[in-house]
Amino acid sequence: MSTKTKSPIGQRTVIGFDFGKKYIGVAVGQEMTGSATPLGSVKATDGIPHWDNLAKYLKEWQPDFIVVGLPLNMDGSEQQLTLDAKKFGNRIHGRFGIQVEFQDERLTTADAKEQLFARGGFKNLKKDNIDAESARLIIESYFEQQYT
């Protein structure tokens, strides 16, 4: 996969990741609509993803770039998980050659849980759903920040 953007700005496809030490949520978004769809999650061991599973999403969706959520403290300062998420993004870029952007993800998990519960009650609050929904919110907040 190459770092060259395949699509014109405004028409690009983006994959978003909600980084976690055990699971990494995945979503896909389209710049044209400013919206994203949750896809699922990839298992990780101490923040290192099962790369083959992650690669399947990249191969299927052929993203023009990737957005990784940055788990900042509420005051905006970094924590160890923030540094781990940056390392994850840098590894993706090094491994697949795809441009990586970072997006503040404060409160996305709480928002994801609230939205999932509203749509399906407690049965909708599965870990996989929460991680993927968080990735969707990360992409959409990136679009809002960039294009509004």
UniProtKB/Swiss-Prot annotation:
GO biological process, any: rRNA 5'-end processing
Pfam family, one: RuvX
Main location: cytoplasm
Protein EC: 3.1.-.-
Keyword flag Zinc: no
Family matches, as SUPFAM superfamilies: Ribonuclease H-like (SSF53098)
InterPro entries from the UniProt entry: RNaseH-like_sf, YqgF, YqgF/RNaseH-like_dom, YqgF/RNaseH-like_dom_sf
Subcellular location(s) per record: Cytoplasm
Enzyme class of the recorded protein, top EC level: hydrolase
Listed GO CC annotations: cytosol
GO molecular function terms listed in the Swiss-Prot or TrEMBL record: nuclease activity
Keywords: Cytoplasm, Hydrolase, Nuclease, Ribosome biogenesis
Keyword Hydrolase carried by entry: yes
Family of this protein: Belongs to the YqgF nuclease family.
Function: Could be a nuclease involved in processing of the 5'-end of pre-16S rRNA.
Protein name as annotated: Putative pre-16S rRNA nuclease
Species of origin: Colwellia psychrerythraea (strain 34H / ATCC BAA-681)
